[in-house]
Amino acid sequence: MILASFLSEWVKLKRKTLLLSTFLGLAAASALFVVLIFSNAPAHGTGGGLPSLQQLARPNGLVFGLTRATFLLGVVAFGTAAAQTASEYSLGTLRQLLVRQPRRATLLAGKMIAVVTFMMLATAFAAVVAFLVANAMAQSRGVSTSAWFTGAGLGDLFNALGNIELAVIGYSILGLVIGQFLRSAVAAVIVGFAWLLVIEQFILTRIVPGAAPWLPGISLSTIAGGGNADFGITYGHGLIVAVSYLVVAIAAASITFARRDVTA
């Protein structure tokens, strides 16, 4: 059953070293983004692309810090997911899992759902910490928070958090797939980070400047931001492109996993 595979994967995910480092690391990074935004926000206008204190007092001011940290959350989700999948091969534990659960599609589905759930919970925890820090920083900078807790403010909050969680799901699935193909945690993380941090930017600046709407990393960041004004990409377009990539990736990983020999 998928539930058994899900619970089996959680035995590994809930180890203190992984759980604490992921949850606390994401929370600290998100809190840092919030502190930097509030500390450097000018009273009026914009400063280096940062929102002003007046903008932070608007209904969507509570989510500024977390949305700026989305790419970091996605990169961590990708790396964690890739490492969890690839390590099954490098440590030789996959063969033991297949003895207990020979239905490979069921095993893969349970593992994917478990890792995605883990990263969603880590992101939610980071969001809670970021929101608490945002309230504290608002008080220190004299920013009114009354608009944050209006109907519009709470709507913006849940909408932003939902978009960020969707993006994290996408990053996690791509990490799982890359880890499945490469079977090496180090190689999977390096390849994924290189694509997200370097290769996509190289494609845009050196090869195909107009390719932004069709790249997976930018599509996921578009979802997280509710659209991408820099490249003129709508939320709907980013969602369609990202889902298309994920469907193809999951199908390819499923076929490969079902047919690949496991000798260790």
What are these regions (language model features)?
Residues 1-28, 183:
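Aromatic- and glycine-rich beta-strand/loop motifs that create alpha-glucan
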Residues 12, 86, 97-99, 175, ...:
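Helix-capping/transition residues at the boundaries of transmembrane alpha-helices
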Residues 17-19, 103-105, 109, 184-186:
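Membrane-helix interface segments
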Residues 19, 23-84, 108-180, 198, ...:
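Secretory targeting signals
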Residues 32-39, 182-218:
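Transmembrane helix segments
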Residues 40-45, 86-89, 93, 133, ...:
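Membrane-interfacial segments
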Residues 78-105:
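Transmembrane helix boundary and interhelical loop/hinge segments in multi-pass membrane proteins
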Residues 241-264:
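Junction motif at the cytosolic side of a transmembrane helix
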